[in-house]
Amino acid sequence: MDVDFGAQAGQSYRTVQLSAKEVLAAGRRQHYCNMIDLLASSCKSSGLIATSFTDDELVEFWLGDILPLMFDADRKIQDCAVAALAEALVALDVSVIHSAKCWPQIRSEFVDKYTIIIGEMRDAKNSNWHKIWTLLVQIMDEDLLRGCVYINKFLALVELGFRNPDNGVRSEAFLCWRVLIKIFAAYDELTSAKRLRLLLIPLRTSQSRSSHVSGIKLRVWWYLLSCLDHELPKSFDSAVEHFLAFMLGGGPRNLATGLAHNYQTARELALPCLVALWGVESSEPLQRLMRELRLETLVQPSPLMSVEVFQQHWKPLLAAAVSGLKLLTENDATEAEQLLLQLLVRNLCLAMFRLAVAPFNVACCSEIEKILQAEDNSGGRVVRALFNTIAADNLVMERVSGSDHLDVLEAYLKLVLKSKTEVPAAILQRSIACIFAVDRIEANNQNEFRMLGSFAELLMQANDEEDFEGFAFKLQVWRQVSQALSNYLRNNALEYRVAHNASLLDTWLLWPLQTLAAFAGRRASNSFDASFCDQWRQLVNAGQNAPGRKKFLTDLKATLTDLLKSKDEPLFAELFDAYVTSLIKFGLCKEAPLYKDVFGLLQTIFEQPSSQKTLEACLNTLRNLVVELRQNELMVVFDSLKPTLSSGIQCWNKMKCEGGFLEEWKRGIQEKFRKLPMKTMANQLKELFKADDLFVIIPSVWSLNPEKLTDRQKERFAEKSDIPALYNDMSQSQDSASIKPWTPKKVVIAKSKQGELALTGKDDNGEVIDITASEESEKEPVRVDVVTPIRKKPGRKSQAQKELEAAARAASLAEEPPKRQTRTRAAQKETEQVAQPQPAFEPQLRSPKKLPPSPVVQSTAAAVKQAKVAKPTPVVVIAQSEDLFPEVAAEPEPQPEPVKKPDPVPETTQLTPPDVPLEAVPSTQLPGSSGDPAASAGAVAAGEMSPKKSGTRIYNLSSPPDRKQTNNSSSPTLRPKPTGHLTGRGAQLINMIRNKKLDAASGSPYACMSTSRLVHQVTPARAQDRAEQVSTPTSELNELTGTDHTSTPIQAPPSKDLLVFSKRLPSPSASPSVSILKRKLRCESLDDVTLDSPALKRKRVSFHDPPVSVTKEYLRDAEETRSSLKPKRCLLMDKVAQTTEMRQALRRRGRLDSIIEIERFASEQTARTATTDKSLDKSTGEAPEEDAFTSLKWNDTGNAHNISISEEPVKAMEVESELETAGQDLAIMDPEAALDLAVAQLPLESVLQRYFDKSPLKSAGMLAKFLSAQMTANEKLKTNVLETLSENHSKDFLDHAVRENLSSVVCDRLNPTSVLEYVCAKSKISASCRNGLLAQVPEILKSGPRSDSERLAFVQQLMVQCSPGDDLLLDLIDLLMRTRRERNNSTSTHISKGVVSAVGSPDNVAETAADSSSNL
C-alpha cells in the first residue's frame, strides 16, 4: 500500500500550528522557543502543502501571530521567530501573501509600526535588526517599489546604518542593501539611471575602514555588477570604473591605492573579479575559483570585451590590470594567484591580438616593459606568460587599420628586444612569427608600403646596448618584413625605381651583412641559413633596374669583403653568387671597376682561410661568370682573369682539397674558350692550366756570394726575401720584369735514389711549389708587408764560417721528418674515421682539415735581411660547430689553445718551440715568432683562426733546403742515405752531421712523437667540462710552485767562437724544427706539481765538428727565491690553468684562513653574540641556537661551514642583568649599525611591542608626541591618524574632544539645524529640556524679530497651536490688560519726575551723566 508522506507531513504541520495557537493564546512564554522551533521544522518538512489550511489562514498565522514575536523583549524568542519566519518565506510564496485579505493591514503595520522598532533595535546594536529588515523587505517585494513612502521608510533605516560609527552596524547595512539590489534586479529596475544612481550612493560614498566591512561591501558591489549583466557597458562610468578604483586605485580621483592593497581578504576577492571583467574568453578554472569564493559569476565573455566598448574604456581597464599584475608578482604567489596571473596575462594578450585597438596595444606593451624593468625583477613572469600564450596558441593578430599599425609594430619590437633575457629563444622566435606574420604586415597599397618602409628604417636603427642575441631576433623580423616587401615589389616593380625606395631597399639589403660583420668575434652561432639567402637573393634581383645600382654593387662588394675577413661564414658563397649574378645582369664591362671588384673579391677569398665547400662554390661561381661572358667581354677581362684563375688553382692545391672538382672546373672553362673564334686566349689558358703540373727540383748544392751583388740587386733581393730559392744566376738583371726559373746544368741521380726523386703532380701527400711568371706578379703584393727585422751580430766572422753555420742549421731542420710525418697521417686517418659515421650533422660538422702551427723560423748570419723558412705540419681539426674560434678575431696575439686528444695515446709532457737566434738576453717574444711581431702575430692568427693547412713553402735564399723538404710528406720511414751527387765540402759536412744525429735520435723516445694536434673548439659553456685537460707552459707551472731554479751559463772554451743563445723553452728535448707539441697535464692540486720536469733542465746541443758546432743554453727567467713549503697567496690568475681542481685548491686555502679567524673571533665573543641572538629572537619564541656569525655565512659555492656555538655559554649568560647585556651589545656592534639592522630585519610592531612591554606609559607618551609633531607637518598623516583613532575609539575620542573644548567651540562645529532638531526632539521626552527651551522664547522674541508684526504673528501662531479654552482666554486677556496699565503708569511717572528735576536743579545734569558712566 502506497503511503502519502506529503499528506502525513501536512497533517503533522496542522497539528503543530493548532498547538502553537493554543500556547500563544495561553501566554505560556516558557514554551515559546520550543514551539517556534517545532513549527519551523514542520514547515520545512511539509512545505506548507496539504495542511488543510487556507492561504489566508496561513498568512494570518505567520504574519499576524509569529512575525510580532521577532520584536519580543526576550532575545531567544527573537532569534527563534526570525529563523522560523525565514523558513516559512521559502514555502510561502510572496504572491500568496499579497493576495491575502489581511495583507493591507499587515503592510500598514510594517510601515508605521515595525520600522520604528527596527530603528530602535539598530541603535541598541541588536544584530537582528538587519535580519528583520531583510525579511520585511522580502515580504513587501514589489509593493516596495510602487510607493515612495514605503521605500523611503525602509531606506531611512539603512541610511543611518551606513552612517553608524560601529563597523558591525555598517556591515549589516550593506547586507540589507544586497537584498534591495536583488528586488530591483528582479523587476528590471536597474535599467533606470535613477534607480541605479540610488543603489550606488552608499557604495561610492560610504567608507570602508575595516577588513570585514570592505569585504562585504566588495561582495555587494560585485553582486550589483553581476545583476547588470549585459547592461554593464552602459553603466561603465558610474558603476564599473568606480568599482575598479575602489579595488585597485586610480579612477577619476586618481587614488594611489585601493582596497586590495590594504586588506588581504579584499585582495583575494578583488583579483578574481578583475580577471572576470577582462574575460575575453570563457574559463572553467576561473568559474570554479569564483564558486569557491562564493562570488557571483559574470557572463563570459565579458560584456566589456567588445571592440566598441573597449575602444572607449580601455584606459581604466588597463590601469586596473597593471595594478593587478603588480600585486600578483610582488610576492610569492599562492596557487590561486598563479592561476589568476596566467588568466589575466592571457586575457590581455587576447585583447591585444583580437580587439586590434592600436592605442591600447602600444600602452599595454609600454606598461609590460615598465614591469619588466622593475627593481624586484618580478616582470619576468609576466613576459614569459605573455609570449608563452602567443607561441602556444599561434595567435593571429588582427591588423590595425591606418597609420597606427606602425606604432603597434614598433611597440611589439621594443617589447621583444627587452624580453630576450627573460624568455627562451625558441618561444620568442615563434612569437615573432605570430606577431610579424607576413599576411598581417604586407602592403596592399602605396601608403601601406610607405608605412612598411618606415618600420624597416626603425628596425635598422642601431642601439648601443644591442648584442648579437638581439640582432638574431631582429634578423628574424627582417625576414618577415623582407617577405612582405618581396610580395609587394613582385606586383609593383616600378616602386623600386623611385629614388627614395631604392635607397631604402639597398640599405635594407646591406644591413644584415654589415651588422653580422660588426659582431665578428662576439657571436656564438651563425644566423644565416638557406632561406635567408634565398630571400636576400630575391630582393637583390628585384632591384636590378633601380637607380644608383652601381653604387649599391660597390657597397655590396665592400660589405662582402668585411664579412669575409671578420669571420668564417658558411653561406658566404651563396651571397657571393647572388652578387656576381646581379653584376652580370647589370653589365660587367659597362663600368671598368666592376669586373675588377669581382676579381679582387675572389683574390681575397683565395687568400682567406675557408672550407673546401666554400672554395668549390666560389670557383663554380667564377666558372659560371666566365661561361656567361661574351667574347668581347672576355677580351676585356682576360688580363685580370688569368691571375685570378691561377690564384684559385694555387688555393686549391694549398688546401690539399680532394675530389675531381678542379679538373671538371678546368674543363668547363677551357670548353668555353675553345668555342671562341679567337684561339689566343684558349692557348694561354691551356698553358696556364698546364703550369699547374710544373715541379722544380732544387739540389742541396747551392752557392751564393752576396758580395758580388750590386746595391740595386741587394734591394731587389731584400724585397723578394720570402720567395723560394728558385734562382741560380742572381747576377742577372734584377730590374727586368720577369725572373727566369733556374734548371740545373747536370743532375746525377743514382738508381737507388730514383724513388726519392720521382715526384708527380698526382701525389696528394706532396708539397707542390708552383711559381710561374704570371703568378709572381700576383704574389708579390701580398707578401710585401712581411718585414724581416735586422738583428745584431754577436761578432765578426769570416764568410766561410757563416756559410757553414747556415748549412748546419739547415741540416738540423731535417732530423726526424720521416717518422713524424708517418704518425701525422695515421692520426689524420683515425680522425677521419671518427668523423665519417655522422653524416646527418653535415651542416654543423665539417670534415677534418689541417691547420698550420706557428711557423718555424731559421736564421743565417748573412749581411742581408733574413727570410723565413716555414715547415708546415699537418694538423687534424675536429670541428664542433660552424663557428670556429669565436674569440680569436678580437685578440691581437692569439695563444695556442688547450688541446684534447680523444684517442688513447700515451701522455707525454713535451713543449718544443722553435729555435730563434737572438742575443744572449731573455726573449720577450712568443714561441715561434720572428723578430717582426706583426708578421708573426699575423701568421699565428692565420693558423688558429681557420682550420686549413697552408701549402706555401717559403725558403731562405742563403740557406738552401734539401730534397727532403720538397716532398717530406711522402718520405720513407727508413733513415735516408746521403746523396752521392753532392760534392761540395759544406755538403759533405752536412751529410756527416745528419748521419750522426739520426743515429742518436733513433733511440730517443722523442723521435717518434707526432706533431699532430687536436685543436678543439672550446666554448665558454663547455669550458668547465673539459677543464681537467689543459696545456700549461712549464714556466707558468714554475710560478705556481713558488720555487726558484736558477741556471748558470755554460762556460764555452775560449778557443771556440761559440754563439750563445738564451730563450725560455718549456721542453728543449724535442726536435728544434718541430712546433709546440701536445701535452696533457692533470693538475690535482697546487702541491702535486712536480719540479723535475725536463723543462727545468739545461740542454747542450752541439754538432761534433768544431767549425760548425753551436752551443745553445736555455735559461729560464729568474724569479725571487721562495720556499716550496709556504703556499703562494698572490697568484696571477691569468697564468694559472683554470681547472676545477685548481679552483678548489685555491678556494680551500682561502677558506681555511677565514675559518680560523672566524673561529678565533667567535670564541672571544660567544657570550655577547648568544645574548644578542636571544634578544633578537625573543619575539618569535625561538631558542637562540646560533651566534651572529651564523647569519654571516661564508659566501662560497662549495661546502659552507657554519660555526655553531655550544649552548653552555648561552645558559651562563641568561642570568646576567639587562644593563650588562646592553653594554655587550654595544661592544659587538655599533649602535647605528645595530639600529639599521633592526630597522631592516624587524617589523615596527615588534620594536614598539618591546618598548611598551618595558615602560608602557613612557613609550605611549613619546609615541604620542612623535605623532603629534609629524601630524603638524603632514596633512595626510594627520588625516590617517585621526581617522584611525575615531574609528577604533569613536566614543572616547569624541568625549575627550568635547571635554577639552568649550561648549561654544563644539557647537560652532555643528549644524544649527541638526542641533535644533535634536533639542526639540529631546524636549519632547525631557521636562527640564522643555522648560529651558520655553524659557528662551521671550528672549528670542526680544532679540529676534525687529518688527511688532513679526512678534504678533509668532504669538498668534503659538495661540493657535495651544488651542486654549474660554476660561484660559479670559485669564490671558486680563493679564494683558493689567500689563498694559502698568506699562502706561510707569511711563508717565518717569517722564514727570525727570522734567521737574531737570528744571529745579541745574546740577542734576552732571549727576545724571555720572550715573550713566558708572552704569557703562
Curated annotation (Swiss-Prot):
Effect of mutating T1019A: Probable loss of Cdk1-mediated regulation leads to lack of dissociation from chromatin and block of replication resulting in anaphase chromosome bridging during mid-blastula transition in embryos; in the eye imaginal disk, results in complete lethality with pupae developing into headless nearly adult flies
Gene inactivation effect: Embryos have a reduced hatch rate and develop into adults with reduced survival. During mid-blastula transition in embryos, S phase 14 is significantly shorter. In larval salivary glands, loss of DNA underreplication resulting in abnormally enlarged chromocenters. RNAi-mediated knockdown results in lethality. Escaper flies only live for a few days and are infertile. Females show increased necrotic spots in the abdominal segments. RNAi-mediated knockdown in the imaginal disks does not affect viability.
Cellular-component GO terms for this entry: chromocenter; chromosome, telomeric region; chromosome, telomeric repeat region; heterochromatin; nuclear replication fork; nucleus
Keyword Cell cycle: yes
Localization of this protein: Nucleus; Chromosome; Chromosome, Telomere
Modification comment: Phosphorylated, probably by Cdk1; phosphorylation regulates dissociation from heterochromatin.
Pfam families: Rif1_N (PF12231)
Tissues showing expression: Expressed in nurse cells and follicle cells in the adult female (at protein level). Detected in adult at extremely low levels.
tRNA-binding listed as a keyword: no
UniProt region (Disordered), positions on chain: 789-858, 886-984, 1021-1054, 1166-1186
Oligomer status and interactors: Interacts with Pp1-87b. Interacts with SuUR (via SNF2-like region).
UniProt record similarity statement: Belongs to the RIF1 family. Highly divergent.
Name listed for the protein in its UniProt record: Telomere-associated protein RIF1
Species whose genome carries this gene: Drosophila melanogaster (Fruit fly)
